């Protein structure tokens, strides 16, 4: 989404322990690394797109890094801005984001919440960044992110269940499997 919106690949660094994923991003001219600390040191914005259960392990070796001049964006479901601040003690600007699955094809919806220390400039950057993969909406109370997470995680499943029921109904009315799709 970012590259399609014209964001320069040379402004992005992707850190991933998986060699195949690094190769995938490298083919688009994106810098890749396995050294989180080095990448973070040279970045203004740090996006944590990891499973919530591994976030603490990712952050632990970074606790001594100075995040005071960086925007932290987290896509780790259920991890509060307070918890992120505990994991990254020097972080001043933290935004939680919960995109839904259609974001993978640029048609998503993302809920955002910013902690009280996040500047308007950082809020705007986070919103612009997420707008590259769909629409955005800000919530004013972090507890509302639970509802956003539930909707983001569940709504695609309900939609596909609805489509399967429609297909089954059409097949019961005489259409074959291909026609009912």
Please place each PLM-identified region on the residue numbering.
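NAD(P)-binding Rossmann-fold cofactor-contacting core
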Residues: 5-26
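Small-residue helix-packing motif on alpha-helices
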Residues: 12, 22, 39, 176-181
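Rossmann-like NAD(P)(H) cofactor-binding subdomain of soluble oxidoreductases
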Residues: 19, 25-28, 36-48, 52-112, ...
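Short acidic-hydrophobic, aromatic-tinged amphipathic segments that line or gate anion-handling sites
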Residues: 31-36, 138-139
């Amino acid at each position: 989404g970012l590259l399609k919106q014209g964001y320069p690949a040379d402004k992005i660094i992707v850190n991933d322990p998986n060699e195949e994923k690094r190769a995938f991003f490298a083919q688009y001219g994106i810098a890749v690394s396995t050294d989180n600390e080095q990448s973070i040191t040279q970045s203004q914005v740090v996006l944590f797109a990891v499973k919530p259960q591994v976030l603490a392990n990712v952050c632990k070796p970074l606790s001594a890094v100075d995040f005071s001049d960086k925007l932290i964006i987290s896509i780790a479901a259920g991890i509060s801005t307070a918890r992120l601040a505990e994991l990254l003690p020097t972080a001043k600007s933290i935004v939680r984001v919960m995109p839904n699955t259609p974001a993978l094809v640029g048609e998503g919806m993302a809920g955002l919440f910013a902690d009280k220390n996040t500047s308007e400039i950082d809020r705007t950057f986070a919103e612009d960044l997420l707008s590259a993969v769909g629409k955005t909406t800000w919530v004013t109370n972090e507890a509302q992110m639970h509802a956003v997470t539930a909707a983001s995680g569940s709504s695609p499943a309900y939609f596909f269940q609805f489509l399967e029921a429609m297909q089954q109904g059409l097949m019961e009315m005489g259409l074959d499997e291909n026609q009912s799709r």
